[in-house]
Amino acid sequence: MNRRQFCVSAAAAGVAATAGAAASESALQTDGAAAASKPVDGAPNLFTPLKLRGVTLRNRIAMSPMCQYSSEDGFANEWHVAHHAARAMGGVGLLLAEATGVTPQGRITPNCLGIWKDEHIPALRKVTEFVSAHGGVPGIQLAHAGVKASRHRPFHPTPNAFVPLEEGGWMPVGPTAKRYGQDGPVPHELTAEEIRAVTAAFAAAATRSLAAGFRVVELHFAHGYLGHSFLSPLMNERKDEYGGSFDSRVRFLLESVRAVRAVLPEETPLLVRLSCTDWVEGGWTLDDSVEVSRRLAKEGVDLIDCSSGGASRQAQIPVGPSYQAPLAERIRREAGIATGAVGLITDPAQADAIIAEGKADLVLLGRELLRDPHWPHRAWTALKPASPPPIAREYAWALPETRR
């Protein structure tokens, strides 16, 4: 699977219960920055806690949002519970659910998760309850696929091809009536009123997320999906208040952040995933990401999840181990906001060094956690072999290495 394939009104009582649980955990931190944590009992840097507002992660390891393409009508099912459960028991600190459509048309495929209606809440709550019961923090990535919507899932006979309208597909939308790639219809260019409706959908989805038990919310503004397509000059050719200048191109992002932050309790962290550079001349740049991250910090965003690419097939991406960590490091240093590093982070020493050297506050693992849900346990053993790894008691009793 390539990286693009990885994407991936509440009851008042449910929201209040979620907010109360988060508030009781720890003192409120309101400056939007991650709290510095000293090593606990000589733990490796990767295993120090991370405090974001009123939520404390048990370590610096996060599961990157990865589409499972296993939903019907947006509903979570047993697969999603098992996917998250395995990694929560494996020791992951923050588990981010896949790109979850804030509208039916906001899904990448007909088989992606959704949170556009209240009926989605109970099934998602099964996921969050299990994660929370096993020491993980459940988070969700809210998304709209934009011009990349209505695609077949990657294990379909015609992977990633456009799903025709007569087969249950839908019309993609974007900032401009401009197609990404060669197949599928020309997207519908959103009106200003329709853009504001999507912003409202993000806020409504955030409210449902709280009712479902998610304690961290991330907005997906990367990889050529709707949010990123407004930011990138390669995809946004509008001439109104949502296109043209830098200030106009970041308007949709800032308005969405304000709308979501307004419905979240003060103790709930808000993350934003950015494609920090398009890797194409004339596109969105790292300088742009630094500047918008400064603005996001002032709007109450707590961490920038630093990815890249997705706006152009001509991108020259220097793929290699930790290749996006320098993006996270610069934004962390110059924008004064916590960051997450993602992309080909596979080795425990590599991940630990990213934290130790101040390149990022969090490391997000994708494929490596698909290969090994217990990667955190393996990482602990590699980094601190003389001490028993923090393994769930249901497993620990049977493993000699936990009784040293």
Predicted features, each with a name:
Residues 18-25:
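C-terminal segment of classical bacterial N-terminal signal peptides
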